[in-house]
């Protein structure tokens, strides 16, 4: 929420400054092409995320992995992030953001001061989202998602104030995502049951302001919130010592999955646009 308020304040300040110029509405009808560059990061709403287990392989998660004495093998807990340490005391690194850059093209129609349009966008990004479980052996087990790129189809509606156009935007998003698993456990075998690379979808919502510096060229600032629905990534633990925690219920092993299928991203971008 703090991030959204800061972005809204910046966009609002630019809009207010332009409105103060009391310019007449310019002509925004037509096609355009442009580029964007900015920064994206994981929304801080998954702090309670953990890894869940299916010990009897019936497709239902929430089972407790038990040691030979009946104790919870994962009593050490979980952390939101990635670690290379086998114990939780070693700490976890937070989720990582990264630069974003891409291209867009679209078309606007102007009706008085109201401007409505559609656009398509392709953006390269680098945002990572991890969760780690710790067993008492000790060992760490990390499930990670890497967002590599976004395709989006959005509508936008704005109110032209001379050469300045504040607007809201929203639409559909597709994402190129890599999913991976790593562990410090060398006693068992870990197999990816789900595909590691996939396209997933979701939606985007945001706001921005665009200002014409010439009749054809404009610069802009934009905030976007993206929510993606990852339908689950499963890893199976098998092998190891006879009667071990992962094979004591079902000899074929135990499945791992993460509790949160949502991948939520904040993005702040600058845009440069050429209008035909």
Roles of regions detected by a PLM:
Residues 2-276:
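Gram-negative outer-membrane beta-barrel domains
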């Amino acid at each position: 929420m703090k991030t959204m308020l800061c972005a809204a304040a910046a966009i609002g300040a630019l809009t207010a400054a332009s409105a103060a110029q009391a310019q007449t509405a310019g002509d925004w009808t037509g096609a355009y092409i442009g580029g964007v560059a900015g920064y994206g990061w994981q929304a801080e709403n998954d702090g309670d995320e953990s890894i869940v287990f299916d010990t009897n392989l019936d497709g239902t998660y929430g089972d407790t992995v038990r040691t030979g004495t009946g104790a919870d093998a994962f009593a050490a807990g979980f952390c939101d992030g990635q670690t290379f340490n086998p114990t939780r005391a070693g700490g976890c690194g937070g989720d990582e953001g990264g630069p974003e850059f891409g291209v867009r093209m679209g078309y606007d129609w102007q009706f008085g001061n109201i401007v409505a349009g559609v656009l398509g966008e392709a953006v390269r990004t680098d945002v990572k989202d991890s969760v780690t479980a710790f067993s008492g052996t000790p060992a760490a087990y990390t499930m990670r998602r890497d967002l590599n790129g976004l395709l989006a189809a959005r509508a936008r509606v704005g109110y032209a104030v001379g050469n300045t156009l504040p607007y809201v935007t929203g639409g559909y998003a597709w994402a190129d995502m890599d999913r991976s698993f790593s562990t410090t456990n060398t006693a068992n075998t870990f197999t990816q049951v789900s595909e590691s690379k996939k396209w997933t979808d979701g939606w985007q919502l945001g706001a921005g302001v665009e200002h014409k510096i010439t009749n054809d060229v404009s610069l802009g600032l934009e905030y976007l919130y993206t929510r993606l629905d990852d339908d689950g990534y499963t890893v199976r633990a098998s092998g190891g010592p006879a009667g071990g925690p992962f094979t004591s219920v079902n000899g074929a092993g135990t499945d791992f999955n993460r509790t949160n299928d949502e991948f939520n991203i904040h993005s702040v971008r600058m845009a440069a646009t050429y209008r035909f």
